[in-house]
Curated annotation (Swiss-Prot):
Keyword Ribonucleoprotein attributed: yes
Gene (UniProt): rpsP
Family annotation (Pfam families): Ribosomal_S16
GO molecular function: structural constituent of ribosome
Protein name: Small ribosomal subunit protein bS16
Native source species: Francisella tularensis subsp. holarctica (strain LVS)
Protein origin, superkingdom: Bacteria
GO biological process: translation
Gene Ontology CC: one annotated term: cytoplasm
Length: 82
């Protein structure tokens, strides 16, 4: 099964997430099929909090990819902002 989820990056206590399409069996931060964007929960000032290619996300959802709960809410947020 293919899922759209977040892969954690960044330093300790400074999380940064890539939004990726991956096989469900792959490790959280492991192999992925395609990168769709990023999410920075600790963005300050002029830093960008969320960047997501909505067209690619919609294409993967049409192919049957299942988004995680958090990614589903981020896709809604990105659509609203666009």
């Amino acid at each position: 099964m293919v899922v759209i989820r977040m892969a954690r990056g960044g330093a300790k206590k400074r999380s940064f997430y890539r939004i990726v399409v991956a096989d469900k069996r792959s490790p959280r931060d492991g192999r992925f099929i395609e990168k769709l964007g990023f999410f920075n929960p600790l963005a300050k000032g002029g830093e960008e909090r969320l960047k997501l290619d909505v067209a690619k996300a919609e294409a993967w959802l049409a192919k049957g990819a299942q988004p995680s709960d958090r990614v589903a809410s981020l896709i809604k947020e990105a659509k609203k902002a666009a």
